[in-house]
Swiss-Prot record:
UniProtKB keywords: Flavoprotein, FMN, NAD, Oxidoreductase
Enzyme class: oxidoreductase
Keyword Membrane: no
EC numbers: 1.6.5.-, 1.7.1.17
Keyword Transmembrane helix included in the entry's annotation: no
InterPro entries the UniProt entry points to: Flavodoxin_fold, Flavoprotein-like_sf, FMN-dep_NADH:Q_OxRdtase_AzoR1, NADH:quinone_OxRdtase_FMN_depd
Protein's recorded name: FMN-dependent NADH:quinone oxidoreductase 5
Length: 203
């Protein structure tokens, strides 16, 4: 079994989403000891944003690419291959300015590829990644679930993975982290309890 672990917070060791995503992965490994983990730190090893250079590289035959185009093509190919190979994907998605970090969006743009993770048919779009499990670690300073301010965060990720054909999407939440130490502590404690007591109860 293969697990892809994605971190995207810029806060390093001070990051709540990193702490919780690592707890999720450790709990998963305890339940599935044979799991092989691939780790991507999108903040410390950022993927360049989707650009005209990305499109040109994709449209240029491999033998004709220059060094920059080869680099762009390799970034896309590796990110896509890791995602497609994974049975389970753990995505740490802190909220920055009502949406996901720009580093996470850059990764998404490398894996959202027609003919690879989805395709268009006469009946409409069809996801090609059914059967995967996605666990999203959702953190935020405020309380946004069910609010208009949360649409570009959790709702966006639900739509995205659903578009890929993934229906097994779970959220581990620690919200209200900026509402004082007591609220933060409870939010983190509740999230850790969900991970240890509920998330893999059926495993």
């Amino acid at each position: 079994m293969k697990l892809l672990h994605i971190d995207s917070s810029i806060l390093g060791d001070n990051s709540a989403s990193r702490q919780l995503s690592h707890s999720v992965v450790e709990a998963w490994k305890a339940a599935h000891p044979a799991t092989v983990v691939t780790y991507r730190d999108l903040a410390n090893d950022a993927i360049s944003h989707f650009s005209a250079a990305t499109l040109v590289a994709a449209g240029t035959a491999a033998e004709l690419r220059d060094a920059a185009q080869k680099h762009e093509a390799q970034l896309s190919a590796q990110a896509l291959a890791e995602f497609k190979a994974a049975d389970t994907v753990v995505v740490a998605a802190p909220m920055y300015n009502f949406t996901i970090p720009t580093q996470l969006k850059a990764w998404i743009d490398r894996i959202a590829v027609a003919g690879e993770t989805f395709r268009y048919t006469e009946a409409g779009p069809q996801g090609l990644c059914g059967g995967k499990k996605v666990i999203v670690v959702s953190t935020s300073g405020g309380l946004h679930v069910g609010q208009a301010t949360g649409v570009a965060h959790e709702d966006y990720l639900k739509v995205l993975f659903g578009f890929f054909g993934i229906t097994d999407v779970e959220f581990v939440r620690a919200h209200g982290l900026a509402y004082g130490e007591e609220v933060r502590s409870k939010a983190m404690s509740d999230a850790q309890a969900q991970i240890s007591q509920q998330l893999f109860a059926a495993a």
